[in-house]
């Protein structure tokens, strides 16, 4: 009789040892083993096949066949009809005892491993609870502190940005209005400058007219003076002539008195004198009238020129006052524009600095949020790994429980009583030789997944003969 014991542990396939654990992977393998056993012998026990379905953290599903079979080393047993071969029974009992001893040792080891697994599962559950508490605490802190602070600061920043945008728009509108006012004032200044230039040119022409009138007046005054001098000279000459004539008349009168016989010259002289006096009076009157007319014309022209000059001076003074007032207004508007531009530049600089600070704050908060997310993701991955390990350990525990229950049920079966067997004599030579083979078909199915989707699936068949 020969005995073959096949035992395997899915823990070694999953962890590689009592205290190690493998990382999760994205592939799964399904291994199915079917075992058929054909044996000859009256005392041969049927083989038992157990399938273990285990799940490791890497997603590997394996099926193993553990069978304990007892086979006879000879094709048949030669027994007498009324006698029992007790040596064969002793050999079977000895072999069965050895098998039971080995199974007890293996069960003891399995119990020790099972106790270690339970301790490890309890430790991992405690760690899992601690990590869950830390995760809930971090979630609560993130929701209560960081989220509120971030939202409040973002609202404050948005409010300040909106206020600065409104201030900037208002300042730009004021700047545009001031620019329009400045353009309008510049156009008005240009118009006033043109009018002033026209007034200055008119004033210059008036000044030339005044100068010409002054020259004409001086010329006329000189002419009047010369005429007055001429009139005085003519009057003096006339007086002298009159005196001479009177003297001549007196002399002639004396001569007439002396010489009565001479012709009467008094009447002739009187007539001549009257003629000269009438001519002189006429000339004097004409000269006075001409002088008066000329003087009146010159006075009127001078008055007109004086009025025009006075009006031009008044207009020039008015234009000068307007130019000064407009210059003052332009200077004031320039100062206001410069101050507004300076304020606008300062506001833009302050806005840029505040915006940069807000961007830095937002970036820092986003970095903190990203770090918190990464830390939460890391905790979630660790939690998932622990869950996978826990599931694997639960499946391993269930598997060992099934093994233990199967072994307990097998141990509780009664042993066969060889003394009560009704055996008959059999000729070994008359029995045909039957070649006993055990055919095992191994199906390996590999499925690769990524993000919950199947990306590759392969199947392999292996046939083994025993």
Swiss-Prot record:
Region (Coil 1A): 96-131
UniProt keywords, alphabetically: Acetylation, Cell membrane, Coiled coil, Cytoplasm, Cytoskeleton, Glycoprotein, Intermediate filament, Isopeptide bond, Membrane, Nucleus, Phosphoprotein, S-nitrosylation, Ubl conjugation
Cross-link (Glycyl lysine isopeptide (Lys-Gly) (interchain with G-Cter in SUMO1)): 445
Residue numbers bearing the N6-succinyllysine modification: 120, 129, 188, 294, 445
PROSITE patterns for the chain: IF_ROD_1 (PS00226), IF_ROD_2 (PS51842)
Region (Coil 1B): 154-245
Annotated site location: Stutter: 351
Region (Coil 2): 269-407
Residues recorded with modification Phosphoserine: 7-10, 25-26, 34, 39, 42, 47, 49, 51, 55-56, 66, 72-73, 87, 144, 214, 226, 299, 325, 409, 412, 419-420, 430, 438, 459
Biased composition (Low complexity): 1-13, 20-31
Pfam families according to UniProt: Filament, Filament_head
Superkingdom of the source species: Eukaryota
Carbohydrate-modified residues: 7, 33-34
Covalent cross-link (Glycyl lysine isopeptide (Lys-Gly) (interchain with G-Cter in SUMO2)), residues: 104, 120, 129, 139, 223, 262, 294, 313, 373, 439, 445
GO cellular component, one term: nuclear matrix
Subunit structure: Homomer assembled from elementary dimers. Identified in complexes that contain VIM, EZR, AHNAK, BFSP1, BFSP2, ANK2, PLEC, PRX and spectrin. Interacts with BCAS3. Interacts with LGSN. Interacts with SYNM. Interacts (via rod region) with PLEC (via CH 1 domain). Interacts with STK33. Interacts with LARP6. Interacts with RAB8B. Interacts with TOR1A; the interaction associates TOR1A with the cytoskeleton. Interacts with TOR1AIP1. Interacts with TOR1AIP1. Interacts with DIAPH1. Interacts with EPPK1; interaction is dependent of higher-order structure of intermediate filament.
UniProt comment concerning the protein's domains: The central alpha-helical coiled-coil IF rod domain mediates elementary homodimerization. The [IL]-x-C-x-x-[DE] motif is a proposed target motif for cysteine S-nitrosylation mediated by the iNOS-S100A8/A9 transnitrosylase complex.
Protein name per Swiss-Prot or TrEMBL: Vimentin
Native organism taxonomy: Eukaryota, Metazoa, Chordata, Craniata, Vertebrata
């Amino acid at each position: 009789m020969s005995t073959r014991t096949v035992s395997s542990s899915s823990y070694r396939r999953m962890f590689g040892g009592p205290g190690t654990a493998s990382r999760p992977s994205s592939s799964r393998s399904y291994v199915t083993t079917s075992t058929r056993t054909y044996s000859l012998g009256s005392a041969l026990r049927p083989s038992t096949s157990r399938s273990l379905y285990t799940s490791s953290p890497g997603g590997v599903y394996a099926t193993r066949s553990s069978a304990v079979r007892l086979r006879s080393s000879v094709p048949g047993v030669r027994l007498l009809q009324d006698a029992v071969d007790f040596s064969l029974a002793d050999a079977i009992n000895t072999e069965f005892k050895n098998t039971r001893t080995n199974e007890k040792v293996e069960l003891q080891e399995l119990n020790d491993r099972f106790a270690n697994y339970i301790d490890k599962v309890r430790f991992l559950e405690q760690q899992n609870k601690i990590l869950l508490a830390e995760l809930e605490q971090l979630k609560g802190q993130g929701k209560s502190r960081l989220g509120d602070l971030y939202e409040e600061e973002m609202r404050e920043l948005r409010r300040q940005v909106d206020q600065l945008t409104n201030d900037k728009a208002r300042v730009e509108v004021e700047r545009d209005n001031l620019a329009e006012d400045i353009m309008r004032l510049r156009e008005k200044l240009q118009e006033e400058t043109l009018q002033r230039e026209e007034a200055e040119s008119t004033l210059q022409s008036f000044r030339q007219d005044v100068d010409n009138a002054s020259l004409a007046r001086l010329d006329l005054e000189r002419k009047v003076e010369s005429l007055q001098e001429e009139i005085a000279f003519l009057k003096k000459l006339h007086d002298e002539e009159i005196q001479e004539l009177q003297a001549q008349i007196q002399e002639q009168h004396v001569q007439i008195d002396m010489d009565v016989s001479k012709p009467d010259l008094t009447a002739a002289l009187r007539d001549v004198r009257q003629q000269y006096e009438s001519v002189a009076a006429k000339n004097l009157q004409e000269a006075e009238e001409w002088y008066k007319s000329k003087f009146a014309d010159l006075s009127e022209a001078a008055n007109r020129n004086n009025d025009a000059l006075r009006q031009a001076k008044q207009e020039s003074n008015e234009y000068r006052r307007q130019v000064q007032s407009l210059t003052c207004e332009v200077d004031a508007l320039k100062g206001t524009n410069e101050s507004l531009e300076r304020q606008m530049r300062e506001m833009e600089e302050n806005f840029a600095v505040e915006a940069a600070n807000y961007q830095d704050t937002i970036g820092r908060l986003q970095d903190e949020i990203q770090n918190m997310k990464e830390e939460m993701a890391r905790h979630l991955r660790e939690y998932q790994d622990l869950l996978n390990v826990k599931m694997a350990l639960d499946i391993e525990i269930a598997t060992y429980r099934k093994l233990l229950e199967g072994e307990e049920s097998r141990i509780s079966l009664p042993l066969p009583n060889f003394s009560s067997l009704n055996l008959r004599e059999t000729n070994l030579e008359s029995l045909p030789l039957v070649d006993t083979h055990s055919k095992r078909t191994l199906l390996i199915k590999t499925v690769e997944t990524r993000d919950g989707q199947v990306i590759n699936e392969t199947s392999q068949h292996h046939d083994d003969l025993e």
